[in-house]
């Protein structure tokens, strides 16, 4: 259950998703969809929630790496002393990863429902990097189950997966608005 001393991720995720939905802007170029379409709303909600959870997982993995390094070097002070034990922090990381992965999977599936013209809708960059991110997270979760991957391995895979996800969303926006529009 959520009785661990780690805060529930919904405290951060839900307001972040709401903010993203309020600030959403039309994608440059391509065909615009009716945003009142409930299926598209589900796609957006699933995708933004997955992104927020996986962003939290990336932050959690950085904290876990710092905590582990300070404990290993016997320099645990300040914030690290106030954190839950490593095992609890790692469990929280994988809870975020599993939930984010499920939502990312659903977001990708629902996204494919809206593809009319992959190139004209400027979806190639976003889709390719999202699928690479999905594969990285799938590999990490499989490695955890199959080989018991933990700590630094989990940190590296989490940050790699989130890096690809970041490239999918921020990178595609940069490519469309800066490189292609120039």
Predicted segment positions?
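Cytoplasmic-side transmembrane-helix entry/capping segments in multi-pass membrane proteins
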Residues: 7-18, 153-160
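Interfacial loop-to-transmembrane junctions
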Residues: 143-164
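Short alpha-helical packing/oligomerization segments
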Residues: 113-139
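Juxtamembrane boundary at the C-terminal end of a transmembrane helix
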Residues: 167-182
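Membrane-interface interhelical connector segments
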Residues: 67-89
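Transmembrane alpha-helix boundary signature
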Residues: 1-11, 23-35
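Transmembrane alpha-helical segments of integral membrane proteins
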Residues: 108-112, 134-149
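Alpha-helical transmembrane segments
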Residues: 42-62
